[in-house]
């Protein structure tokens, strides 16, 4: 099986490169800049192609070249392994080979236009010589002057004239200032496909092959030990637990913790799935009082996440002790959780996830995270491979900390119950209207401000709730629904929101105003906290 190694310099979309490569049927892994690829090669580990990611830093700040870059280019010279540098990776290549890289006079962010001045095997069938093409840029530095010796310019920025694409055909080294991995670059997927063809990669990576590999990896990692699985009824933990159960059978103990912060009827959904449909035993722990006690008076979202993460692990450690010889804790952590927590060497932290940055530094259980390198859409594909019902796989994502991060400010029992009912009305009406399956994620947020209203002949002073609905494929970027829909569809959704607003205000005491969140990701995250 071919392998593409992606060197992560801290871009928030690095994992999209891995996802695009996998979509094209080639296995990919993400490595930190400190990786010793020469040592890996000496141990017989074969890498078929390298991709250097973007990142938030500047090559002007470098004191020497990262080990991984030296290794990558030495392996390119010795073994002819193709290399593609993207954005910061492109600047790194230019810097390594002697070009001057400095801050641009005019920085480029978002859509940009390029003039195609030379053909390239990367752009074959994608760009036409002499054409003007649009791409997605996000950079502050550019090559100043000429490209390095041995390289030629394929495309320049139409606005600034800066080099946007250079290549060294003899050594199969390619550098692009733009981001072919994002959906906003037309033809980006085809360019990556051409790069994989140049590398001679075999297209044999599928969810079936991933499943086979992971079963072996789980067996090896657990080494006969028992595993306690943290399940929530959501897509991620459901797929992860079924996968681990397939690998180790009865050595897996499933535990469902009712934090008091879950969706309405969640415990029943979990019992129906795992006990009724999958014939897996589940221990149900009602720890709602403990979580509410720990969260009392806390307003800061990062502190809330840390408390939930620490309490979550504490509960599982206690349960593991009561169960006997438990050595491992399974969690349904996925790639976007890891990325946004900024746990890589070069990543910029956005927020903690209770499955990642919210974990205490010292644990008495070793983690098993079989989905850690999968995106949400890949998790669903794996779930289908495992035979999970669509009723579970098509559920909207729900955050590990639950409703606590959808209540701005302090979490109280009153606020949790109010938000739970608001969310239930919103989602039930969305299902009834046939909208649910067209939306990637929808939820309600309780805003800790009160506004004046009028109901009947009386004055009210109630909370504001915000409704959110987004479209996405992987959770890394998202548009508010119904962006991109027809005008008729937009009007239908507006009418739907009005019905939901009336239902919430009419049926629930404590809320007298409903607003809709129109923000995309970026600049916002999907969840409010």
Curated annotation (Swiss-Prot):
Residues 205-395 form the GMPS ATP-PPase domain. The lineage of its organism: Bacteria, Pseudomonadati, Pseudomonadota, Alphaproteobacteria, Rickettsiales. The keyword Nucleotide-binding applies. ATP binds at residues 232-238. It comes from Anaplasma marginale (strain St. Maries). The gene is guaA. GO terms for cellular component: cytosol. Its EC number is 6.3.5.2. HAMAP family: GMP_synthase. PROSITE patterns: GATASE_TYPE_1, GMPS_ATP_PPASE. The active site is at 87 (nucleophile), 179, 181. It catalyses: XMP + L-glutamine + ATP + H2O = GMP + L-glutamate + AMP + diphosphate + 2 H(+). InterPro entries: Class_I_gatase-like, GATASE, GMP_synth_C, GMP_synth_GATase, GMP_synthase, GMPS_ATP_PPase_dom, Rossmann-like_a/b/a_fold. Homodimer. This is GMP synthase [glutamine-hydrolyzing]. Pfam families: GATase, GMP_synt_C. PANTHER family: GMP SYNTHASE [GLUTAMINE-HYDROLYZING], GMP SYNTHASE-RELATED.
């Amino acid at each position: 099986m071919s392998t593409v190694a992606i060197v992560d310099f801290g871009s928030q979309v690095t994992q999209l490169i891995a996802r695009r490569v996998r979509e094209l049927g080639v296995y990919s892994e993400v490595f930190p800049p400190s990786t010793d690829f020469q040592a890996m090669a000496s141990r017989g580990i074969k890498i078929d192609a390298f991709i250097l990611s973007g990142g938030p830093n500047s090559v002007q700040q470098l004191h020497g070249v990262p080990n991984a870059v030296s290794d990558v280019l030495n392996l390119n010279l010795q073994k002819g392994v193709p290399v593609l540098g993207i954005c910061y990776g492109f600047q790194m290549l230019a810097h390594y080979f002697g070009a001057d890289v400095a801050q641009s006079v005019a920085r480029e962010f978002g859509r940009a236009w390029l003039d195609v001045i030379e053909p390239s095997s990367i752009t074959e069938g994608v760009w036409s010589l002499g054409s003007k093409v649009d791409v997605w840029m996000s950079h502050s530095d550019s090559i100043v002057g000429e490209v390095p010796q041995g390289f030629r310019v394929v495309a320049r920025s139409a606005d600034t004239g800066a080099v946007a694409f250079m290549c060294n055909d003899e050594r199969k080294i390619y550098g692009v200032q733009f981001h072919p991995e994002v959906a906003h670059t037309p033809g980006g997927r085809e360019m990556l496909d051409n790069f994989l063809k140049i590398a001679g990669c075999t297209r044999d990576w599928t969810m079936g092959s991933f499943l086979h590999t992971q079963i072996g990896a789980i067996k090896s990692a657990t080494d006969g030990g028992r595993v306690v699985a943290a399940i929530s009824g959501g897509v991620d933990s459901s797929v992860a637990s079924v996968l681990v159960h397939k690998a180790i059978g009865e050595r897996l103990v499933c535990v469902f913790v009712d934090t008091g912060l879950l969706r309405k009827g969640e415990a029943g959904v979990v019992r129906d799935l795992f006990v009724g449909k999958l014939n897996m035993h589940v221990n149900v722990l009602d720890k709602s009082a403990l979580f509410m006690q720990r969260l009392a008076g806390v307003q800061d979202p990062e502190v809330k996440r840390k408390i939930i993460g620490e309490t979550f692990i504490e509960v599982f450690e206690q349960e593991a002790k009561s169960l006997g010889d438990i050595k491992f804790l399974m969690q349904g952590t996925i790639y976007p959780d890891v990325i946004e927590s900024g746990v890589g060497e070069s990543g910029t932290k956005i927020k903690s996830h209770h499955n990642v940055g919210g974990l205490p530094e010292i644990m008495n259980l070793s983690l098993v995270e079989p989905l850690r390198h999968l995106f949400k859409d890949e998790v669903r594909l794996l779930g289908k491979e495992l035979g999970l019902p669509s009723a579970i796989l098509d559920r909207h994502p729900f955050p590990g900390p639950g409703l606590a991060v959808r209540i701005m400010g302090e979490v109280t029992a009153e606020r949790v119950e109010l938000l739970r009912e608001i969310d239930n009305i919103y989602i039930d009406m969305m299902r009834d209207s046939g909208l649910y399956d067209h939306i990637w994620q929808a939820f309600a947020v309780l805003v800790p401000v009160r506004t004046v209203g009028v109901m009947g002949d009386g004055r009210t002073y109630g909370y504001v709730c915000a409704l959110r609905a987004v479209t996405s494929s992987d959770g890394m970027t998202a548009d508010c629904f119904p962006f991109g829909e027809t005008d008729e569809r937009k009007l239908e959704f507006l009418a739907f929101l009005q019905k939901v607003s009336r239902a919430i205000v009419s049926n629930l005491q404590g809320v007298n105003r409903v607003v809709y969140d129109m923000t995309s990701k970026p600049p916002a995250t999907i969840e409010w906290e």
